[in-house]
From Swiss-Prot:
Function: Binds to actin monomers and regulates the organization of the actin cytoskeleton. At high concentrations, profilin prevents the polymerization of actin, whereas it enhances it at low concentrations. At low concentrations, associates with the poly-proline motif of formins to enhance actin filament elongation rate. Acts redundantly with PRF4 to regulate apical actin polymerization at the tip of pollen tube and control polarized pollen tube growth. Functions probably by favoring formin-mediated actin polymerization at pollen tube tips.
Pfam families (UniProt xref): Profilin
Disruption-associated phenotype: In germinating pollen grain, the double mutant prf4 and prf5 reduces the amount of F-actin and induces disorganization of actin filaments within the apical and subapical regions of the pollen tube.
Protein name: Profilin-5
Source organism of the structure: Arabidopsis thaliana (Mouse-ear cress)
SMART domains the UniProt entry points to: PROF
PROSITE patterns: PROFILIN
Keywords annotated in UniProt: Actin-binding, Cytoplasm, Cytoskeleton
């Protein structure tokens, strides 16, 4: 399966609410910031933003004082899992990032999709990639 198929079929899929809702945007990005695959509307991020996100995985809490930025938009960092998941909130939406052995799985959402639905979609694929050694 191509990386793009993972994004299209496993991240931009129905979130399982029975109403056809899905994430706003999604991507799989290497630890070095290279884009492996992304949805058409995934925001154009700055390399430093990915560097800062990777640093927060290595040093949990690094982003908490300043917030997390993606494409210049600021997300308030909320509860995550050290070295595994970063979650952010911005207005009626937010972001979930799951770190795997070689990549990061990004999911962005807006209401009516809930944070829990985004977490489930992103972390399910991330866990699968970890199981596959990726």
């Amino acid at each position: 399966m191509s990386w793009q198929a993972y994004v299209d079929e496993h991240l931009m899929c129905d979130v399982g609410d029975g109403q056809g809702h899905h994430l706003t945007a999604a991507a799989i990005i290497g630890h070095d910031g290279s884009v492996w695959a992304q949805s058409a509307n995934f925001p154009q991020f700055k390399p430093q933003e990915i560097t800062d996100i990777m640093k927060d995985f290595d040093e949990p809490g690094h982003l908490a004082p300043t917030g997390m930025f993606l494409a210049g938009l600021k997300y308030m960092v909320i509860q995550g899992e050290p070295n595994a998941v970063i979650r952010g909130k911005k207005g009626a939406g937010g972001i979930t990032i799951k770190k795997t052995g070689q990549s990061m799985v990004f999911g962005l959402y807006e209401e009516p999709v809930t944070p829990g639905q985004c977490n489930m979609v992103v972390e399910r694929l991330g866990d699968y990639l970890i199981e596959q050694g990726l």
